[in-house]
């Protein structure tokens, strides 16, 4: 269990005066026939979940992971309400009822969650650049609003998508497990805000042993580097820089990293949700690292992605200290120029790319039966076919 003593939540963390709020808009969609290629184990888990829940609420439904979760829930016959700032017509076509709104608006969140019996809180502001409020408002206040709505509406199952960044302090993470405490010093607002939100989620969990009529059960999952076909983040960035010949490795030695294929990340969320449906869930009130459980060097991972598009492997290296110095200079310049886009290098990225990041996922295996369905090798075949 993670040591939460280094995380504190103050009233300032929840303060937010929103911009003109997005007007809540609901648009329905007819149930569509979805053809997903599901592993027998995933199909079994989905069938079991469909027997326990009838209506799921998914924040960040239009995102890479959120969409994958929605597709599986709909395929299992579970009604899905998706919550996002945009409409996402492709989800409506699948049968997802999309609700447009803002996580920082508690009334919009509560209204959208009416009638649901399980919540997947996937949405977050991710990145390494931007001011504090741009991360804390959606990530911390948004999480608080989701928890409050669950309690107000008596929704008793809440699955939260966290991140391994909550433990990263700029040092190697080699086979760490959930006993590793939150970082003593956070390297960006994203990691800090997600750590606070994760702690809120776990603190909101209520013991199943109580005789109370309503008990909220929560779990947090920490997927690392989600990738696969239609990935809007890692894969396109690697390929774009690879095509320009600007991709470089950071550090003198290869460090191992864990990643997770998109189908595996969605499957882990389904399994955790199913475990929460038990009378005494093993996973409630806990956080879990999840990955493909196949640590590879950063060079190998990048080169496998490049090979999917017929691009040559990356071989050039930049010393970690040089990358860090360049990141510091760029950060200063971007702030002075008030540039909103993310610099191509930051101090955090330099640290991240030169450290190992792989995890002991034994707890996820033991508590809710997770293991990867799709290997990296098979995932790369699917990625190549999609490009």
UniProtKB/Swiss-Prot annotation:
It catalyses: a (2R,3S)-2-alkyl-3-hydroxyalkanoate + NADP(+) = an (R)-2-alkyl-3-oxoalkanoate + NADPH + H(+). Disulfide bonds: none annotated. It is an enzyme of class 1 (oxidoreductase). GO terms for molecular function: oxidoreductase activity, acting on the CH-OH group of donors, NAD or NADP as acceptor. Its EC number is 1.1.1.412. Disruption phenotype: Deletion of the entire oleABCD gene cluster leads to the complete absence of nonpolar extractable products. The oleABCD deletion strain shows a significantly longer lag phase than the wild-type strain when shifted to a lower temperature. Involved in olefin biosynthesis. Catalyzes the reversible stereospecific NADPH-dependent reduction of 2-alkyl-3-oxoalkanoic acids to 2-alkyl-3-hydroxyalkanoic acids. The S.oneidensis oleABCD genes produce 3,6,9,12,15,19,22,25,28-hentriacontanonaene, which may aid the cells in adapting to a sudden drop in temperature. This is 2-alkyl-3-oxoalkanoate reductase.
